[in-house]
Amino acid sequence: ACVGENQQCADWAGPHCCDGYYCTCRYFPKCICRNNN
């Protein structure tokens, strides 16, 4: 399963972002998915 926009994700091991999203840790310590666009 993948997670969508503003959902918590992890760069190293799941959950991973759905297609069209990337994981950012700008909001450390919580990493969230953001739209690629």
From Swiss-Prot:
The modification Asparagine amide is found at residue 37. InterPro entries: Beta/delta-agatoxin_fam. Expressed by the venom gland. The keyword DNA damage does not apply. One of its GO terms (cellular component) is extracellular region. The keyword Coiled coil does not apply. GO terms for molecular function: sodium channel regulator activity; toxin activity. Keywords: Amidation, Disulfide bond, Ion channel impairing toxin, Knottin, Neurotoxin, Presynaptic neurotoxin, Secreted, Toxin, Voltage-gated sodium channel impairing toxin. Disulfide bonds join 2-18, 9-23, 17-33, 25-31. It is found in: Secreted. The presence of a 'disulfide through disulfide knot' structurally defines this protein as a knottin. Belongs to the neurotoxin 07 (Beta/delta-agtx) family. 03 (aga-4) subfamily. Aga sub-subfamily. Insecticidal neurotoxin that induces an irreversible spastic paralysis when injected into insects. Modifies presynaptic voltage-gated sodium channels (Nav), causing them to open at the normal resting potential of the nerve. This leads to spontaneous release of neurotransmitter and repetitive action potentials in motor neurons. This is Mu-agatoxin-Aa1d. It comes from Agelenopsis aperta. The lineage of its organism: Eukaryota, Metazoa, Ecdysozoa, Arthropoda, Chelicerata.
